[in-house]
Amino acid sequence: MAEEPKGVPLSELSLQQLGELQKNCEQELNFFQESFNALKGLLTRNEKSISALDDVKIATAGHTALIPLSESLYIRAELSDPSKHLVEIGTGYFVELDREKAKAIFDRKKEHITKQVETVEGILKEKRRTRAYISDAFQTKVQSQLATMNTQ
């Protein structure tokens, strides 16, 4: 059987090694924070899509509306068939669906993104805890070296 890998106690690392470890941990923390923010943005966009489906539900054929092409660019368009919705199912892939199927896709996306948010949230908590341990070890090491220098 393979043995479980053993870590090196933080107290045995030099100041330089602790500094590098702290820097790496900070970079990882920033990466996961950016991922978390991006996922929250996706969740918000998905919620807006679900809300838009509800808004179109009450519309009739010939209804005029502003359609978003991007977050800041809208065009005026006429709704030809309020029962059909164009839904992005992948990068650059769209499919025309009825309201129930479109809502089901958005609900699945919401569920998937929510799970990803929860996963990244857990990783962020762990990374913050690790950063605190490393920071404490670094401070302890600095104080220890200062005390050693003062006694000499």
Curated annotation (Swiss-Prot):
It comes from the Eukaryota. Coiled coil: none annotated. GO terms for molecular function: unfolded protein binding. One of its GO terms (biological process) is RNA polymerase I assembly. Keywords: Chaperone. The keyword Transmembrane helix does not apply. GO terms for cellular component: cytoplasm; prefoldin complex. The keyword Manganese does not apply. Pfam families: Prefoldin. Belongs to the prefoldin subunit alpha family. Heterohexamer of two PFD-alpha type and four PFD-beta type subunits. Binds specifically to cytosolic chaperonin (c-CPN) and transfers target proteins to it. Binds to nascent polypeptide chain and promotes folding in an environment in which there are many competing pathways for nonnative proteins. This is Probable prefoldin subunit 5. It comes from Caenorhabditis elegans. The lineage of its organism: Eukaryota, Metazoa, Ecdysozoa, Nematoda, Chromadorea. The gene is pfd-5.
